[in-house]
Amino acid sequence: MSQTDGRITMAINQKLTNIIEGRVVKSCREGASEVQIRFQDGSTMMVKVMESNSPPLREGSQVRRVHENGTELMIDSEDGTTLSLQLIEPGNSISVRDKDGAAEYLG
């Protein structure tokens, strides 16, 4: 994490960004320990969380990039909204599966 112009910036998770960039959110549901994001292409992202610090991503928003630093995960969308989450276990809290259930990302 670095600080620029008074704002804290986090490293981009390039692998995850490359997988979900451009996908359009169909729904975003936040539970007590898990956030589920369904995309219009039928894929699903599950994130095990300690807490969510922001409102869910809006239906129809398009993913721009994903930032990660330790337990912090931020998903930016093209409409300017950001989903900010605290991961339960870095490296073992995120899964993305395609419409057939095949793993695209585990980390």
List each model region and its residues.
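Surface-exposed, interaction-prone regions used to assemble/regulate multi-protein complexes
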Residues: S2-G107
